[in-house]
Amino acid sequence: MTGLGVRSSSYGSLEKTGLNGVVLPIQITTTTRTKPSKMQKDREGIVHWICKFAGRKKVGMLLLFLISAVVFLRVLYVGKGEDSQEGQGPPSLHFNGSSGVNYSNMLQTNEELNMNIGNISFKAKEVIVFPPPPIHFLGYSLPQGHPCNSFTLPPPPADRKRTGPRPCPVCYLPVEEAVALMPNAPSFSPVLKNLTYIYEEPLNRETEFGGSDFGGYPTLKHRNDSFDIKETMSVHCGFVKGPQPGRNTGFDIDEADLLEMKQCRGIVVASAVFDAFDDVKAPQNISKYAEETVCFYMFVDEETESILKRERGLDGNKKVGIWRVVVVHNLPYSDGRRNGKVPKLLVHRMFPNARYSLWIDGKLELVVDPYQILERFLWRKNATFAISRHYKRFDVLVEAEANKAAGKYDNASIDFQVDFYKNEGLTPYSVAKLPITSDVPEGCVILREHVPISNLFTCLWFNEVDRFTSRDQISFSTVRDKIAAKTNWTVSMFLDCERRNFVVQRYHRAEQERFARQRPPVPNFPPPPPSPPPPVLISSDLPRKMSSGRATPPRRRGRDRRSGQRGHRKANLPVRLPDSA
Protein backbone atom coordinates (compact mmCIF):
# COMPACT_ATOMS: atom_id res chain seq x y z
CA MET A 1 0.00 0.00 0.00
CA THR A 2 3.01 2.17 -0.42
CA GLY A 3 2.18 5.31 -2.25
CA LEU A 4 -1.55 4.93 -1.71
CA GLY A 5 -3.53 7.23 0.51
CA VAL A 6 -5.15 5.84 3.61
CA ARG A 7 -8.85 6.73 3.89
CA SER A 8 -9.56 8.29 7.18
CA SER A 9 -12.78 8.86 8.97
CA SER A 10 -13.00 12.44 7.72
CA TYR A 11 -15.83 11.72 5.27
CA GLY A 12 -13.76 10.75 2.22
CA SER A 13 -10.53 12.77 2.79
CA LEU A 14 -7.24 10.98 2.14
CA GLU A 15 -4.21 11.09 4.30
CA LYS A 16 -0.78 11.20 2.67
CA THR A 17 1.83 9.05 4.31
CA GLY A 18 5.00 10.95 4.62
CA LEU A 19 8.44 10.04 5.61
CA ASN A 20 9.02 8.05 8.77
CA GLY A 21 5.36 7.06 8.82
CA VAL A 22 4.09 10.60 9.46
CA VAL A 23 0.64 11.05 8.10
CA LEU A 24 0.14 14.46 6.46
CA PRO A 25 -3.38 15.71 5.86
CA ILE A 26 -4.26 16.37 2.27
CA GLN A 27 -7.12 18.81 1.65
CA ILE A 28 -8.74 17.80 -1.60
CA THR A 29 -11.76 19.58 -3.02
CA THR A 30 -14.01 17.00 -4.55
CA THR A 31 -17.24 17.32 -6.44
CA THR A 32 -18.37 13.78 -5.72
CA ARG A 33 -21.68 13.48 -3.82
CA THR A 34 -21.18 12.56 -0.17
CA LYS A 35 -23.25 9.98 1.57
CA PRO A 36 -26.08 11.57 3.57
CA SER A 37 -26.07 11.15 7.32
CA LYS A 38 -28.66 9.24 9.24
CA MET A 39 -30.24 12.41 10.73
CA GLN A 40 -30.65 13.90 7.28
CA LYS A 41 -32.25 10.70 6.05
CA ASP A 42 -34.74 10.85 8.92
CA ARG A 43 -35.75 14.43 8.07
CA GLU A 44 -36.18 13.55 4.42
CA GLY A 45 -38.32 10.61 5.40
CA ILE A 46 -40.60 12.81 7.47
CA VAL A 47 -40.99 15.21 4.55
CA HIS A 48 -41.79 12.35 2.15
CA TRP A 49 -44.30 11.00 4.67
CA ILE A 50 -46.03 14.38 4.94
CA CYS A 51 -46.10 14.79 1.18
CA LYS A 52 -47.53 11.31 0.83
CA PHE A 53 -50.60 12.01 2.98
CA ALA A 54 -51.10 15.72 2.14
CA GLY A 55 -51.31 17.62 -1.08
CA ARG A 56 -48.96 20.36 -2.14
CA LYS A 57 -51.33 23.15 -1.14
CA LYS A 58 -51.77 21.77 2.34
CA VAL A 59 -48.03 21.38 2.71
CA GLY A 60 -47.55 25.01 1.68
CA MET A 61 -50.10 26.20 4.19
CA LEU A 62 -48.45 24.16 6.91
CA LEU A 63 -45.04 25.60 6.11
CA LEU A 64 -46.50 29.13 6.08
CA PHE A 65 -48.06 28.54 9.47
CA LEU A 66 -44.79 27.26 10.92
CA ILE A 67 -42.84 30.21 9.54
CA SER A 68 -45.39 32.67 10.96
CA ALA A 69 -45.22 31.01 14.37
CA VAL A 70 -41.42 31.20 14.37
CA VAL A 71 -41.47 34.87 13.39
CA PHE A 72 -44.06 35.69 16.07
CA LEU A 73 -42.07 33.93 18.80
CA ARG A 74 -38.92 35.66 17.65
CA VAL A 75 -40.51 39.12 17.76
CA LEU A 76 -41.98 38.40 21.18
CA TYR A 77 -38.61 37.31 22.50
CA VAL A 78 -36.80 40.33 21.05
CA GLY A 79 -39.43 42.73 22.43
CA LYS A 80 -39.11 41.25 25.89
CA GLY A 81 -35.36 41.53 25.70
CA GLU A 82 -35.61 45.22 24.79
CA ASP A 83 -37.89 45.91 27.77
CA SER A 84 -35.53 44.16 30.14
CA GLN A 85 -32.57 46.15 28.84
CA GLU A 86 -34.28 49.57 28.91
CA GLY A 87 -31.91 52.32 29.87
CA GLN A 88 -28.87 50.34 28.72
CA GLY A 89 -26.97 50.47 25.44
CA PRO A 90 -27.70 47.96 22.70
CA PRO A 91 -25.94 44.60 23.21
CA SER A 92 -22.78 44.18 21.15
CA LEU A 93 -21.90 41.05 19.22
CA HIS A 94 -18.52 39.57 20.09
CA PHE A 95 -16.58 37.40 17.67
CA ASN A 96 -13.89 35.13 19.12
CA GLY A 97 -12.40 34.00 15.82
CA SER A 98 -14.82 31.15 15.33
CA SER A 99 -17.44 30.92 12.67
CA GLY A 100 -20.33 31.36 15.16
CA VAL A 101 -21.61 34.27 17.31
CA ASN A 102 -21.03 34.14 21.03
CA TYR A 103 -24.33 34.96 22.79
CA SER A 104 -23.13 34.15 26.27
CA ASN A 105 -22.88 37.84 27.21
CA MET A 106 -26.45 38.45 26.04
CA LEU A 107 -28.05 35.75 28.18
CA GLN A 108 -29.39 36.69 31.62
CA THR A 109 -29.21 34.77 34.82
CA ASN A 110 -32.35 34.00 36.79
CA GLU A 111 -31.60 36.73 39.34
CA GLU A 112 -31.15 39.34 36.61
CA LEU A 113 -34.32 38.17 34.92
CA ASN A 114 -36.34 38.47 38.14
CA MET A 115 -34.88 41.91 38.78
CA ASN A 116 -35.80 43.07 35.29
CA ILE A 117 -39.31 41.69 35.65
CA GLY A 118 -39.69 43.68 38.84
CA ASN A 119 -38.44 46.79 37.11
CA ILE A 120 -40.84 46.22 34.24
CA SER A 121 -43.82 45.91 36.56
CA PHE A 122 -42.76 49.02 38.47
CA LYS A 123 -42.43 51.02 35.29
CA ALA A 124 -45.77 49.75 34.09
CA LYS A 125 -47.34 51.08 37.28
CA GLU A 126 -45.77 54.46 36.65
CA VAL A 127 -47.29 54.57 33.18
CA ILE A 128 -50.74 53.37 34.19
CA VAL A 129 -51.24 55.42 37.36
CA PHE A 130 -52.04 59.03 36.40
CA PRO A 131 -52.91 61.89 38.74
CA PRO A 132 -56.67 62.33 39.05
CA PRO A 133 -58.18 64.97 36.79
CA PRO A 134 -58.99 68.30 38.45
CA ILE A 135 -62.39 68.39 40.11
CA HIS A 136 -64.65 71.25 39.05
CA PHE A 137 -67.94 72.57 40.38
CA LEU A 138 -70.68 71.56 37.95
CA GLY A 139 -73.66 73.32 39.51
CA TYR A 140 -76.72 71.96 41.28
CA SER A 141 -80.49 72.04 41.19
CA LEU A 142 -82.78 72.71 44.10
CA PRO A 143 -84.95 69.77 45.21
CA GLN A 144 -88.13 69.12 43.32
CA GLY A 145 -90.99 71.11 44.76
CA HIS A 146 -88.74 73.75 46.30
CA PRO A 147 -90.55 77.10 46.49
CA CYS A 148 -87.76 78.89 44.62
CA ASN A 149 -88.25 76.62 41.61
CA SER A 150 -91.74 77.96 41.00
CA PHE A 151 -91.04 81.51 42.13
CA THR A 152 -92.12 84.20 39.66
CA LEU A 153 -91.90 87.95 39.87
CA PRO A 154 -95.18 89.62 40.75
CA PRO A 155 -96.33 92.54 38.60
CA PRO A 156 -95.03 95.92 39.76
CA PRO A 157 -97.39 97.84 42.02
CA ALA A 158 -99.59 100.34 40.25
CA ASP A 159 -98.30 103.54 41.81
CA ARG A 160 -98.57 106.48 39.44
CA LYS A 161 -96.67 108.72 41.82
CA ARG A 162 -93.62 106.44 41.76
CA THR A 163 -92.60 105.54 38.24
CA GLY A 164 -88.83 105.08 38.67
CA PRO A 165 -86.89 101.87 39.33
CA ARG A 166 -87.73 99.96 42.47
CA PRO A 167 -86.77 96.65 44.11
CA CYS A 168 -88.59 93.41 43.42
CA PRO A 169 -88.85 90.20 45.48
CA VAL A 170 -86.04 87.65 45.30
CA CYS A 171 -86.22 84.02 46.45
CA TYR A 172 -83.21 83.60 48.75
CA LEU A 173 -82.37 80.46 50.66
CA PRO A 174 -81.86 80.61 54.42
CA VAL A 175 -78.30 81.41 55.40
CA GLU A 176 -77.67 77.88 56.70
CA GLU A 177 -78.74 76.31 53.40
CA ALA A 178 -76.75 78.81 51.36
CA VAL A 179 -73.61 78.08 53.39
CA ALA A 180 -74.11 74.33 52.89
CA LEU A 181 -74.33 74.82 49.11
CA MET A 182 -71.06 76.75 48.82
CA PRO A 183 -68.98 74.84 46.22
CA ASN A 184 -66.02 72.84 47.47
CA ALA A 185 -64.20 73.00 44.12
CA PRO A 186 -63.57 75.83 41.65
CA SER A 187 -65.66 76.21 38.53
CA PHE A 188 -64.35 75.21 35.12
CA SER A 189 -62.36 77.85 33.23
CA PRO A 190 -62.75 77.30 29.46
CA VAL A 191 -59.53 77.38 27.40
CA LEU A 192 -57.55 79.55 29.83
CA LYS A 193 -55.85 77.59 32.63
CA ASN A 194 -52.83 79.68 33.66
CA LEU A 195 -52.91 83.48 33.88
CA THR A 196 -49.96 85.64 34.88
CA TYR A 197 -49.56 89.39 34.97
CA ILE A 198 -47.01 91.66 33.34
CA TYR A 199 -44.82 94.02 35.32
CA GLU A 200 -42.23 96.18 33.63
CA GLU A 201 -38.95 97.37 35.07
CA PRO A 202 -38.23 99.92 33.68
CA LEU A 203 -41.63 101.01 32.44
CA ASN A 204 -42.05 101.26 28.68
CA ARG A 205 -44.24 104.22 27.77
CA GLU A 206 -44.27 103.76 24.01
CA THR A 207 -47.79 103.15 22.74
CA GLU A 208 -50.28 104.58 20.26
CA PHE A 209 -52.56 106.25 22.83
CA GLY A 210 -53.88 105.82 26.34
CA GLY A 211 -52.42 103.96 29.27
CA SER A 212 -50.92 105.05 32.59
CA ASP A 213 -47.96 104.43 34.86
CA PHE A 214 -50.18 102.18 36.97
CA GLY A 215 -51.76 100.06 34.23
CA GLY A 216 -48.91 100.23 31.75
CA TYR A 217 -48.86 101.29 28.14
CA PRO A 218 -49.80 98.21 26.11
CA THR A 219 -49.75 98.74 22.37
CA LEU A 220 -52.69 97.94 20.15
CA LYS A 221 -50.91 94.74 19.16
CA HIS A 222 -50.69 93.76 22.84
CA ARG A 223 -54.38 94.57 23.13
CA ASN A 224 -55.31 92.34 20.20
CA ASP A 225 -53.11 89.51 21.48
CA SER A 226 -54.79 89.67 24.89
CA PHE A 227 -58.13 88.81 23.25
CA ASP A 228 -56.63 85.71 21.61
CA ILE A 229 -57.52 83.30 24.40
CA LYS A 230 -54.98 80.52 24.99
CA GLU A 231 -54.28 77.97 27.69
CA THR A 232 -51.46 80.07 29.18
CA MET A 233 -51.48 83.86 28.99
CA SER A 234 -49.67 86.85 30.43
CA VAL A 235 -51.47 90.20 30.28
CA HIS A 236 -51.35 93.73 31.66
CA CYS A 237 -53.52 93.97 34.76
CA GLY A 238 -52.50 97.04 36.73
CA PHE A 239 -49.67 97.19 39.29
CA VAL A 240 -47.10 97.07 36.46
CA LYS A 241 -44.30 98.60 38.53
CA GLY A 242 -43.67 95.51 40.63
CA PRO A 243 -44.48 91.84 41.13
CA GLN A 244 -46.37 92.41 44.39
CA PRO A 245 -49.53 94.57 44.14
CA GLY A 246 -49.60 97.31 46.73
CA ARG A 247 -45.84 97.41 47.29
CA ASN A 248 -44.41 100.51 45.58
CA THR A 249 -46.67 99.97 42.57
CA GLY A 250 -49.11 102.80 43.10
CA PHE A 251 -52.24 102.15 45.15
CA ASP A 252 -49.86 101.24 47.97
CA ILE A 253 -51.12 99.46 51.09
CA ASP A 254 -49.49 99.03 54.48
CA GLU A 255 -47.68 95.75 55.00
CA ALA A 256 -49.88 94.73 57.93
CA ASP A 257 -52.99 95.16 55.78
CA LEU A 258 -51.45 93.20 52.90
CA LEU A 259 -50.72 90.28 55.23
CA GLU A 260 -54.31 90.33 56.49
CA MET A 261 -55.66 90.45 52.95
CA LYS A 262 -53.66 87.34 52.04
CA GLN A 263 -55.38 85.46 54.86
CA CYS A 264 -58.77 85.90 53.21
CA ARG A 265 -59.37 82.52 51.56
CA GLY A 266 -63.13 82.44 51.14
CA ILE A 267 -65.45 85.36 50.39
CA VAL A 268 -64.47 89.02 50.36
CA VAL A 269 -66.90 91.94 50.30
CA ALA A 270 -65.08 95.04 49.04
CA SER A 271 -66.00 98.68 48.69
CA ALA A 272 -64.18 102.01 48.48
CA VAL A 273 -64.63 105.70 49.24
CA PHE A 274 -62.18 108.26 47.86
CA ASP A 275 -62.14 112.05 48.13
CA ALA A 276 -64.72 111.76 50.95
CA PHE A 277 -67.31 111.32 48.22
CA ASP A 278 -69.58 109.03 50.28
CA ASP A 279 -70.24 108.00 53.84
CA VAL A 280 -69.22 104.54 55.00
CA LYS A 281 -72.47 102.62 55.35
CA ALA A 282 -72.74 99.68 57.74
CA PRO A 283 -74.10 96.44 56.19
CA GLN A 284 -77.40 95.21 57.62
CA ASN A 285 -78.94 91.76 58.20
CA ILE A 286 -75.55 90.02 58.22
CA SER A 287 -75.51 86.62 59.92
CA LYS A 288 -73.13 85.83 62.73
CA TYR A 289 -71.48 83.18 60.58
CA ALA A 290 -70.85 85.69 57.80
CA GLU A 291 -69.36 88.18 60.25
CA GLU A 292 -66.89 85.50 61.34
CA THR A 293 -65.99 84.03 57.93
CA VAL A 294 -66.46 86.78 55.31
CA CYS A 295 -63.83 89.49 54.83
CA PHE A 296 -65.37 92.99 54.75
CA TYR A 297 -62.85 95.54 53.39
CA MET A 298 -63.37 99.25 52.84
CA PHE A 299 -60.60 101.08 50.94
CA VAL A 300 -60.24 104.79 51.65
CA ASP A 301 -57.76 107.56 51.00
CA GLU A 302 -56.19 109.79 53.64
CA GLU A 303 -58.86 112.49 53.28
CA THR A 304 -61.66 110.02 53.95
CA GLU A 305 -59.66 108.51 56.81
CA SER A 306 -59.51 111.86 58.60
CA ILE A 307 -63.29 112.26 58.33
CA LEU A 308 -63.84 108.75 59.68
CA LYS A 309 -61.59 109.51 62.63
CA ARG A 310 -63.51 112.69 63.36
CA GLU A 311 -67.07 111.46 62.76
CA ARG A 312 -67.01 107.68 63.20
CA GLY A 313 -64.32 107.21 65.82
CA LEU A 314 -61.87 105.28 63.62
CA ASP A 315 -58.90 104.29 65.76
CA GLY A 316 -55.99 101.86 65.74
CA ASN A 317 -58.15 98.76 65.31
CA LYS A 318 -59.04 100.00 61.79
CA LYS A 319 -62.67 98.96 62.17
CA VAL A 320 -65.89 100.82 61.42
CA GLY A 321 -68.62 98.36 62.29
CA ILE A 322 -67.75 95.14 60.48
CA TRP A 323 -65.71 96.98 57.84
CA ARG A 324 -61.95 96.73 58.06
CA VAL A 325 -60.73 100.09 56.81
CA VAL A 326 -57.60 100.03 54.62
CA VAL A 327 -55.91 103.35 53.91
CA VAL A 328 -54.43 103.56 50.41
CA HIS A 329 -51.36 105.69 49.76
CA ASN A 330 -49.80 106.95 46.54
CA LEU A 331 -53.04 106.89 44.57
CA PRO A 332 -52.29 106.31 40.87
CA TYR A 333 -54.88 108.74 39.44
CA SER A 334 -55.96 112.28 40.18
CA ASP A 335 -59.57 111.30 39.37
CA GLY A 336 -61.25 109.54 42.26
CA ARG A 337 -63.52 107.64 39.86
CA ARG A 338 -60.49 106.01 38.23
CA ASN A 339 -58.99 105.15 41.61
CA GLY A 340 -62.22 103.38 42.49
CA LYS A 341 -61.83 101.12 39.44
CA VAL A 342 -58.75 99.48 41.00
CA PRO A 343 -60.49 97.59 43.85
CA LYS A 344 -63.62 97.23 41.73
CA LEU A 345 -62.02 95.36 38.82
CA LEU A 346 -58.70 94.13 40.26
CA VAL A 347 -59.90 92.68 43.55
CA HIS A 348 -58.47 89.28 42.54
CA ARG A 349 -54.99 90.81 42.47
CA MET A 350 -55.39 92.41 45.89
CA PHE A 351 -56.84 89.24 47.46
CA PRO A 352 -54.82 86.49 45.73
CA ASN A 353 -56.22 83.66 47.87
CA ALA A 354 -59.91 84.62 47.90
CA ARG A 355 -62.36 82.39 46.03
CA TYR A 356 -65.33 84.75 45.65
CA SER A 357 -65.82 88.49 45.82
CA LEU A 358 -68.76 90.85 46.07
CA TRP A 359 -68.10 94.44 45.06
CA ILE A 360 -70.49 97.24 46.02
CA ASP A 361 -70.03 100.94 45.30
CA GLY A 362 -69.49 103.29 48.22
CA LYS A 363 -72.94 104.85 47.74
CA LEU A 364 -74.68 101.53 48.44
CA GLU A 365 -75.75 99.88 51.68
CA LEU A 366 -75.69 96.08 51.79
CA VAL A 367 -78.89 94.68 53.37
CA VAL A 368 -78.72 90.91 52.60
CA ASP A 369 -76.24 88.29 53.78
CA PRO A 370 -73.37 87.67 51.29
CA TYR A 371 -73.90 83.89 51.34
CA GLN A 372 -77.51 84.32 50.27
CA ILE A 373 -76.55 86.72 47.47
CA LEU A 374 -73.81 84.49 46.05
CA GLU A 375 -76.01 81.39 46.24
CA ARG A 376 -78.87 83.07 44.41
CA PHE A 377 -76.99 84.83 41.61
CA LEU A 378 -73.75 82.85 41.21
CA TRP A 379 -73.83 79.28 42.54
CA ARG A 380 -77.42 78.46 41.62
CA LYS A 381 -76.79 79.80 38.11
CA ASN A 382 -73.44 77.96 37.84
CA ALA A 383 -71.87 81.26 36.79
CA THR A 384 -68.46 82.74 37.49
CA PHE A 385 -69.39 86.38 36.85
CA ALA A 386 -72.72 88.09 37.50
CA ILE A 387 -73.76 91.71 37.14
CA SER A 388 -77.10 93.50 36.88
CA ARG A 389 -78.19 95.08 33.66
CA HIS A 390 -79.22 98.71 33.40
CA TYR A 391 -82.84 99.27 34.33
CA LYS A 392 -83.58 101.38 31.26
CA ARG A 393 -80.87 101.22 28.59
CA PHE A 394 -79.64 98.13 26.72
CA ASP A 395 -77.63 99.69 23.88
CA VAL A 396 -74.05 100.97 24.26
CA LEU A 397 -74.64 103.72 21.70
CA VAL A 398 -77.65 104.98 23.64
CA GLU A 399 -75.67 104.76 26.88
CA ALA A 400 -72.85 106.83 25.40
CA GLU A 401 -75.27 109.57 24.36
CA ALA A 402 -76.82 109.55 27.83
CA ASN A 403 -73.37 109.98 29.39
CA LYS A 404 -72.68 112.92 27.11
CA ALA A 405 -76.02 114.54 27.93
CA ALA A 406 -75.43 114.16 31.67
CA GLY A 407 -71.88 115.51 31.44
CA LYS A 408 -70.40 112.33 32.91
CA TYR A 409 -67.20 112.70 30.88
CA ASP A 410 -65.60 114.72 28.14
CA ASN A 411 -67.81 114.32 25.09
CA ALA A 412 -64.91 114.16 22.63
CA SER A 413 -63.35 111.28 24.57
CA ILE A 414 -66.64 109.38 24.57
CA ASP A 415 -67.04 109.89 20.82
CA PHE A 416 -63.49 108.70 20.18
CA GLN A 417 -64.07 105.51 22.18
CA VAL A 418 -67.39 104.74 20.51
CA ASP A 419 -65.98 105.34 17.03
CA PHE A 420 -63.05 103.04 17.82
CA TYR A 421 -65.45 100.27 18.86
CA LYS A 422 -67.60 100.83 15.78
CA ASN A 423 -64.57 100.28 13.57
CA GLU A 424 -64.05 96.97 15.37
CA GLY A 425 -67.61 95.89 14.65
CA LEU A 426 -69.75 97.33 17.46
CA THR A 427 -73.42 97.31 16.48
CA PRO A 428 -76.57 98.44 18.29
CA TYR A 429 -78.16 95.89 20.58
CA SER A 430 -80.90 93.75 19.05
CA VAL A 431 -82.69 90.48 19.74
CA ALA A 432 -80.14 88.79 17.50
CA LYS A 433 -77.76 88.85 20.49
CA LEU A 434 -80.03 86.69 22.63
CA PRO A 435 -79.53 84.98 25.06
CA ILE A 436 -77.48 88.08 25.91
CA THR A 437 -80.12 90.38 27.35
CA SER A 438 -78.24 93.68 27.47
CA ASP A 439 -75.05 95.44 26.43
CA VAL A 440 -75.20 97.95 29.28
CA PRO A 441 -74.58 96.86 32.89
CA GLU A 442 -75.29 98.62 36.14
CA GLY A 443 -71.73 98.30 37.37
CA CYS A 444 -72.23 99.32 40.99
CA VAL A 445 -72.43 95.63 42.05
CA ILE A 446 -70.23 92.78 40.76
CA LEU A 447 -70.40 89.14 41.86
CA ARG A 448 -67.59 86.88 40.71
CA GLU A 449 -65.58 83.76 41.29
CA HIS A 450 -61.82 84.12 41.02
CA VAL A 451 -61.05 81.64 38.22
CA PRO A 452 -58.65 82.37 35.33
CA ILE A 453 -61.29 83.28 32.74
CA SER A 454 -63.18 85.74 34.97
CA ASN A 455 -59.89 87.23 36.17
CA LEU A 456 -58.89 87.76 32.54
CA PHE A 457 -62.20 89.47 31.83
CA THR A 458 -61.76 92.05 34.59
CA CYS A 459 -58.10 92.59 33.64
CA LEU A 460 -59.02 93.39 30.04
CA TRP A 461 -62.00 95.46 31.17
CA PHE A 462 -59.67 97.50 33.38
CA ASN A 463 -57.25 97.94 30.47
CA GLU A 464 -60.07 99.44 28.39
CA VAL A 465 -60.96 101.82 31.21
CA ASP A 466 -57.29 102.77 31.51
CA ARG A 467 -56.90 103.37 27.77
CA PHE A 468 -60.22 105.13 27.09
CA THR A 469 -62.74 106.83 29.39
CA SER A 470 -63.50 105.75 32.95
CA ARG A 471 -67.13 105.01 32.00
CA ASP A 472 -66.93 101.24 32.29
CA GLN A 473 -70.48 100.78 30.96
CA ILE A 474 -69.22 101.73 27.49
CA SER A 475 -66.39 99.17 27.34
CA PHE A 476 -68.18 96.27 29.08
CA SER A 477 -69.86 94.63 26.07
CA THR A 478 -66.79 94.90 23.83
CA VAL A 479 -64.60 92.93 26.24
CA ARG A 480 -67.36 90.42 26.96
CA ASP A 481 -68.08 89.72 23.29
CA LYS A 482 -64.41 89.38 22.32
CA ILE A 483 -63.84 86.74 25.01
CA ALA A 484 -67.10 84.96 24.20
CA ALA A 485 -66.04 84.70 20.55
CA LYS A 486 -63.05 82.55 21.59
CA THR A 487 -64.70 80.55 24.37
CA ASN A 488 -68.13 79.44 25.50
CA TRP A 489 -67.89 81.74 28.53
CA THR A 490 -70.19 84.69 29.10
CA VAL A 491 -71.51 86.95 31.84
CA SER A 492 -74.70 86.28 33.79
CA MET A 493 -76.87 89.41 33.87
CA PHE A 494 -79.77 89.67 36.32
CA LEU A 495 -82.52 92.25 36.69
CA ASP A 496 -81.84 95.67 38.12
CA CYS A 497 -84.82 95.35 40.45
CA GLU A 498 -83.22 92.20 41.90
CA ARG A 499 -80.03 94.14 42.58
CA ARG A 500 -82.05 96.80 44.38
CA ASN A 501 -83.38 94.07 46.63
CA PHE A 502 -80.03 93.48 48.37
CA VAL A 503 -78.44 96.94 48.17
CA VAL A 504 -80.00 100.30 48.96
CA GLN A 505 -78.70 103.39 47.23
CA ARG A 506 -77.98 106.40 49.41
CA TYR A 507 -77.14 109.95 48.48
CA HIS A 508 -73.55 111.03 48.01
CA ARG A 509 -72.01 113.05 50.78
CA ALA A 510 -72.19 116.33 48.83
CA GLU A 511 -75.89 115.77 48.11
CA GLN A 512 -76.60 115.11 51.77
CA GLU A 513 -74.86 118.34 52.74
CA ARG A 514 -76.77 120.28 50.09
CA PHE A 515 -80.08 118.94 51.34
CA ALA A 516 -79.10 119.89 54.86
CA ARG A 517 -78.42 123.47 53.76
CA GLN A 518 -81.71 123.72 51.87
CA ARG A 519 -83.77 122.49 54.81
CA PRO A 520 -85.12 125.51 56.75
CA PRO A 521 -83.76 125.75 60.28
CA VAL A 522 -86.11 124.91 63.11
CA PRO A 523 -86.76 128.11 65.18
CA ASN A 524 -85.69 127.87 68.78
CA PHE A 525 -88.47 129.84 70.49
CA PRO A 526 -89.10 129.69 74.25
CA PRO A 527 -92.01 127.50 75.26
CA PRO A 528 -95.36 129.36 75.21
CA PRO A 529 -97.06 130.24 78.54
CA PRO A 530 -99.83 127.94 79.71
CA SER A 531 -103.24 128.79 78.25
CA PRO A 532 -105.98 130.16 80.59
CA PRO A 533 -108.81 127.85 81.60
CA PRO A 534 -111.74 127.84 79.17
CA PRO A 535 -115.04 129.57 80.05
CA VAL A 536 -117.89 127.50 81.40
CA LEU A 537 -120.28 127.88 78.44
CA ILE A 538 -118.41 128.03 75.20
CA SER A 539 -119.89 125.13 73.32
CA SER A 540 -122.21 125.92 70.45
CA ASP A 541 -124.24 122.83 71.28
CA LEU A 542 -125.53 124.27 74.56
CA PRO A 543 -128.75 126.29 74.55
CA ARG A 544 -128.20 130.01 74.51
CA LYS A 545 -129.99 132.38 76.86
CA MET A 546 -131.97 135.06 75.01
CA SER A 547 -132.89 138.42 76.33
CA SER A 548 -136.56 137.39 76.36
CA GLY A 549 -135.73 134.49 78.62
CA ARG A 550 -136.48 131.81 76.05
CA ALA A 551 -133.96 129.06 75.40
CA THR A 552 -133.13 128.41 71.76
CA PRO A 553 -132.07 124.94 70.75
CA PRO A 554 -128.53 124.52 69.52
CA ARG A 555 -127.87 125.16 65.87
CA ARG A 556 -127.97 121.97 64.02
CA ARG A 557 -125.31 120.96 61.50
CA GLY A 558 -126.16 120.33 57.92
CA ARG A 559 -126.55 116.59 58.32
CA ASP A 560 -128.74 116.94 61.40
CA ARG A 561 -130.84 119.55 59.65
CA ARG A 562 -131.46 117.31 56.66
CA SER A 563 -132.35 114.35 58.79
CA GLY A 564 -134.83 116.46 60.74
CA GLN A 565 -136.44 117.63 57.55
CA ARG A 566 -136.83 114.09 56.35
CA GLY A 567 -138.56 113.19 59.61
CA HIS A 568 -140.94 116.16 59.25
CA ARG A 569 -141.90 115.05 55.77
CA LYS A 570 -142.66 111.58 57.03
CA ALA A 571 -144.91 113.00 59.69
CA ASN A 572 -147.05 114.86 57.09
CA LEU A 573 -147.72 111.72 55.03
CA PRO A 574 -151.42 110.84 54.92
CA VAL A 575 -152.50 108.00 57.14
CA ARG A 576 -155.20 105.65 55.95
CA LEU A 577 -157.80 104.81 58.65
CA PRO A 578 -159.56 101.49 58.80
CA ASP A 579 -163.06 103.11 58.48
CA SER A 580 -162.24 104.62 55.11
CA ALA A 581 -161.79 101.25 53.52
Curated annotation (Swiss-Prot):
Composition bias, Pro residues: 520-536
Keywords: Glycoprotein, Golgi apparatus, Membrane, Signal-anchor, Transferase, Transmembrane, Transmembrane helix
Lineage: Eukaryota, Viridiplantae, Streptophyta, Embryophyta, Tracheophyta
Topology relative to the membrane: Single-pass type II membrane protein
One example GO MF annotation: glycosyltransferase activity
Pfam families: TOD1_MUCI70 (PF04765)
Residues linked to a glycan: N96, N102, N119, N194, N224, N285, N382, N411, N488
Transmembrane segments: 59-79
Name of the protein in question: Probable hexosyltransferase MUCI70
Keyword Nuclease: no
